[in-house]
Amino acid sequence: MYSIKKQFLFLFLFLLPLKLFPDEKEPIIQLRVLAHHIAHKIVHAAVEDCVKRGYLVSAAVVDRNGNLAAFLRNPLSGVHTIKVSKQKAFSSATLRTKTSEIAPRRSDLSFAPDILLIVGGVPINFTGNFYGGVGVAGARPDIDELCALAGIEAVSEIMEFVD
């Protein structure tokens, strides 16, 4: 009996500090990812906004790592808009800023693979969380950016209340 109490006491005293003094850093990093239906709403709203402005475009959404999450092409838009919209989205996501803000400052990045420094790529941020990027191609570059912003705006009300 005495031996069991002694062993229990030893284990208790040995394990107690582990609970009282946990590591300062969390062992898990939590990331937020756009649900597929939100990514689809963004590209749909971006393409529709450009149609209202009189332009036929493609729109792409990529996740935080630059992987394609959603894509929509107006059937009458040029075939080149497929690749260009993806590259604009990739550029804004991986550099985490609008392509319109990168281009004047970082021409050296024009040689990086899949980076396209043409206006029309916008990062997707809500409530301080980064989700990825959206790129639009087929209109004038300044209009592409406005349509990308319209795509983000279309889901902003939903995303503002995400916990």
Model-derived regions: residue spans:
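Bacterial N-terminal signal peptides that target proteins for export
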Residues: 1-9
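General helical structural elements
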Residues: 9-10, 92
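Hydrophobic h-region of N-terminal signal peptides that target proteins for export
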Residues: 13-21
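Flexible, solvent-exposed loop/hinge segments and secondary-structure transition points
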Residues: 23-163
